[in-house]
């Protein structure tokens, strides 16, 4: 089986899991967005303007020419986000030099608490090339909408500042042209993620 066939097979399995995830969790992929497709290609991704962990303003155009592996989460996330970023880090390490073609990106869904400084400190535990992105409430909301990420804020009645989030935990693989390639569930293990990336890069 050639690399393209492997990638198509993996994408089919992954997409099925992605759709099942949202069905089980009972929510639209992104409220307010059209749920029907006319082109047969998922409309995921698009323009954004955010701030990285160094304070630099960046847009989607800064990533053109490289693959992107995008994960949405927040630094106060107790388990899913750090475990997902650990899998991302290990998979990229497993790819060796091939991983240089991929830019790993973590976009926060918590614009109020996740400042560039907080992202910078948090991301030191993961891949050295991991780009952390934050922004104003409207900027982060626009990125969430573009990527069709399910996000629901969960308030803490006793301590309002201790709110958390329910959110979709998915790796979004984007092509060199910024186009969406495939969703990869956070439950994917290191070897599976490395294989999916390797097949796409071949």
Predicted segments, located by residue:
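Sec/Tat-exported extracytoplasmic proteins
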Residues: 67, 92-99, 123, 144-151, ...
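Hydrophobic beta-strand anchors of alpha/beta hydrolase catalytic cores
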Residues: 69-70, 104, 171
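Short active-site neighborhood of thiol/selenol oxidoreductases, capturing the structured segment around
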Residues: 60-84, 88
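Structural microenvironment flanking redox-active thiols in thiol-disulfide oxidoreductases
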Residues: 83-143
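Thiol/disulfide oxidoreductase modules built on the thioredoxin-like
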Residues: 139-196
């Amino acid at each position: 089986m050639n690399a393209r066939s492997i990638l198509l097979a993996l994408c089919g399995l992954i997409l099925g899991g992605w759709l099942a995830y949202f069905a089980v969790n009972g929510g639209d992929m992104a409220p307010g967005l059209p749920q029907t497709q006319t082109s047969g290609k998922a409309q995921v991704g698009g323009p954004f303007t955010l701030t990285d962990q160094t304070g630099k303003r960046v847009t989607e155009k800064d990533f053109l020419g490289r693959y992107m592996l995008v994960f949405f989460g927040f630094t106060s996330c107790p388990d899913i986000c750090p475990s997902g970023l650990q899998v991302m880090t290990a998979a990229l390490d497993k790819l060796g030099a091939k991983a240089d073609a991929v830019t790993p990106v973590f976009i926060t869904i918590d614009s109020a608490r996740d400042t560039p400084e907080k992202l910078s400190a948090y991301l030191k535990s993961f891949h050295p090339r991991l780009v952390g992105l934050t922004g104003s409430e409207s900027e982060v909301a626009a990125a969430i909408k573009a990527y069709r990420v399910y996000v629901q804020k969960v308030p803490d009645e006793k301590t309002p500042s201790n709110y958390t989030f329910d959110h979709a935990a998915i790796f979004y693989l984007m092509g060199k042209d910024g186009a969406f390639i495939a969703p990869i569930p956070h439950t994917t293990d290191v070897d599976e993620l490395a294989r999916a990336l390797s097949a796409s890069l071949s």
